[in-house]
Amino acid sequence: MSWQCSKVQEHPKNFTYIVECSDGTLYTGWTNNLEHRVETHNVGKGAKYTKSRRPVKLVYFETYSSKEEATRREWEIKQLSRTEKWKLIKAK
């Protein structure tokens, strides 16, 4: 059992993601469970920003091995302009 736990900790998946809200705006976040996080946004239990802009649609994500990498990338993406974010989305 402890072997499995340590193995999981060696290769965790963390995601930086962008969702498009129903009003056309973009929201960037990070999570360790991408499918669940998008569902959470869509039932109104996610970020305050997305609660009144449902439904949201996943348009972009990147995978990282650590929370620190994912949150660093989240910050970097949040610094981009809307146009730059769309370029990133379309390039993938």
Regions found by a protein language model. Name each.
Residues M1-G46, K51-P55, F61-T63, E68-K78, ...:
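GIY-YIG nuclease catalytic motif and its immediate N-terminal context
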